[in-house]
């Protein structure tokens, strides 16, 4: 079972001696135009470019990305890496096909979050074999805001319940 730690502060100020994993919920349409995604775009522009390319590759069936996570190593030149010993990884969790009025239902978003976390866990297990990623007591650490609770409008308690099922430590940043 996952442990969730709530941290009052800015997700983007999180630092670790190893590479940090910064996760957020994404749409499958290649848009980080609002909410925390817009901040990710500003802090880690190299990852935004790769995210857009990834979505374009799946443009014929964007919903095929649902329930997956695209884990992207950022570049040292990204503003979000200022002051970091190792560059951050951005985990794009595809929880809704679209956004705005076309976003998926809350139930679908929660189900896709569960699948995205499973995908992320398997990627982190492999990555930890070759890269120094943030861990606590041998458990991989993921840092995130209250995903899905903003523009996707999913009650946090529903996402929280799913996150608690997973085998990672999650630092949830709240303002």
Curated annotation (Swiss-Prot):
Annotated keywords: Hydrolase, Protein phosphatase
Enzyme type, top EC level: hydrolase
Reaction it catalyzes: ADP-alpha-D-ribose 1''-phosphate + H2O = ADP-D-ribose + phosphate
Domain Macro: 1-175
Domain of life: Eukaryota
Any single biological process term in GO: peptidyl-glutamate ADP-deribosylation
GO MF term set: ADP-ribosyl-[dinitrogen reductase] hydrolase activity; phosphoprotein phosphatase activity
Xref: PROSITE patterns: MACRO
Family according to the record: Belongs to the POA1 family.
Function field: Highly specific phosphatase involved in the metabolism of ADP-ribose 1''-phosphate (Appr1p) which is produced as a consequence of tRNA splicing.
PANTHER family in UniProt: ADP-RIBOSE GLYCOHYDROLASE OARD1 (PTHR12521:SF0), PROTEIN C6ORF130 (PTHR12521)
Descriptive protein name: ADP-ribose 1''-phosphate phosphatase
Organism, scientific name: Meyerozyma guilliermondii (strain ATCC 6260 / CBS 566 / DSM 6381 / JCM 1539 / NBRC 10279 / NRRL Y-324)
């Amino acid at each position: 079972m996952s442990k969730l730690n709530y941290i009052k502060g800015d997700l983007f100020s999180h630092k670790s001696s190893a590479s940090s994993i910064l996760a957020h919920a994404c749409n499958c349409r290649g848009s980080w135009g609002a909410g925390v995604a817009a901040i990710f775009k500003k802090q880690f522009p190299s990852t935004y470019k790769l995210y857009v390319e990834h979505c374009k590759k799946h443009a014929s069936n964007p919903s095929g990305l649902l329930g997956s996570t695209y884990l992207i190593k950022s570049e040292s030149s990204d503003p979000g890496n200022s002051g970091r010993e190792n560059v951050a990884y951005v985990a794009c969790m595809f929880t809704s096909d679209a956004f705005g009025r076309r976003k998926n239902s809350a139930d679908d978003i929660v189900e896709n979050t569960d699948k995205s976390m499973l995908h992320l866990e398997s990627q982190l297990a492999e990555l930890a074999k070759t890269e120094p990623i943030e861990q606590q007591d041998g458990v991989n650490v993921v840092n995130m805001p209250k995903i899905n609770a903003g523009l996707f409008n999913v009650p946090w308690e529903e996402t929280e319940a799913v996150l608690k099922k997973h085998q990672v430590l999650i630092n949830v940043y709240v303002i």
